[in-house]
């Protein structure tokens, strides 16, 4: 059982991510020429969605963090900001390995961007470098007493093999 302050922080992180996602929804809607009222309604629908409430505040799931990171990845990919896409996606994969299941969509977006603009490979390469730096910064503190990088590969293999489906909460046949 977590002490009260630890439990509050544990619940606060997913709830804060939900609020940031709601604000991002508003900003994207405004950018796509929605009126302030329309964008506000979308933001409120996102912020007060009962499923989101239950997932983050009720069950204290970290899925809201992953959702926000993937939402940012999609947003920056659409904007063509590959130097932001790559490190944020790496962070999403490090938060929850299930983010790897969307990697093929990212690859398709990269291929399409390269077809449209052959000069975007430079920001993409910089983004890959930033993703590697992100991985090193996040993983290094946990690797001190693990004896190499194999612990992380084993952890990901174990985690991904424990999920035969993309989700365990729906009607998988």
Model-derived features with residue positions:
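Short, solvent-exposed helix-helix connector turns and helix-capping sites enriched
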Residues: 35, 81-82
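Primarily membrane-embedded glycan-assembly and transfer machineries that use lipid-linked glycans
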Residues: 1-74, 110-173
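Short A/G/S/P-biased low-complexity tracts
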Residues: 40, 80-81
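Membrane-interface alpha helices of multi-pass inner-membrane proteins
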Residues: 54, 70-76, 83-106, 137
